[in-house]
Amino acid sequence: MAALLRGFSQCVDATHPYAAEVSANIRAACAEAGVPLRRLLRDPGGSFTGIRVDSPEEAASFLAKQMGNILLAIGAKGLPAFSGLDSVRLYPRVLPVEESLAACRRAGIPTRNIIAMHGPFSRALNAAILEQYRIRWMVTKDGGAAGGFGEKLAAARDAGAELVVIGRPKETGDGLEDVLAWLLAAECQKEE
């Protein structure tokens, strides 16, 4: 990745808030290439009434004591945490790629329960999925507006489902205005 950065004067890491491994790779590549880096933080999804947990494992532990079907809108990497739950209750929404489908198979998810689609999803589509599969619990990450968090929140309310939100990893960075100012300041210095 460092080779890709050579010739660039700056880099902005605007990856998903949960893409810690990718962000670490970007930091290492920028350090190796000598390219200044800023982390752009997404605005959080806002307040909601629901359950907030720190990890997929904590969500699974909580849901093991609850009744009802569960929509797992967390990606395929989080599925192993839910392997101790009755798989007929689990409805993972994953990308329609072999890697995600294989993760579902490894987790013992019945094929009829796999929802393989590209997002982000509208409020109406989220609500339709919640109603179609009689979802009582929707497990999601707080991807902010870009990740469709508001649509998930509204759809859960519409369908009478409860949200279980996996909190963001701790990270440092800047908001959009600060990152833009940093980029513009560097551009102005180049022109002088």
PLM regions and their residue ranges:
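Active-site glycine-rich loop that binds ribose-phosphate moieties when present
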Residues: I51-K65, A73-K77, F121-R123
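Intrinsically disordered or low-complexity boundary/linker segments at protein termini
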Residues: R39-E57, C104, K170-E192
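Short, flexible loop segments at boundaries between secondary-structure elements
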Residues: E99-S100, E162-G173
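Short acidic active-site motifs
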Residues: M1, E58-A59, G78-A81, E99-S100, ...
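A C-terminal functional module that forms or caps the active site or interfaces directly
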Residues: R105-A159, V164-I166
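Glycine/small-residue-rich loop that forms an oxyanion/phosphate-binding "nest" at active or ligand-binding sites
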Residues: A2-A59
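Structural motif
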Residues: S9-Q10, N69, R136-W137
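Anionic-ligand binding region
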Residues: I70-I114
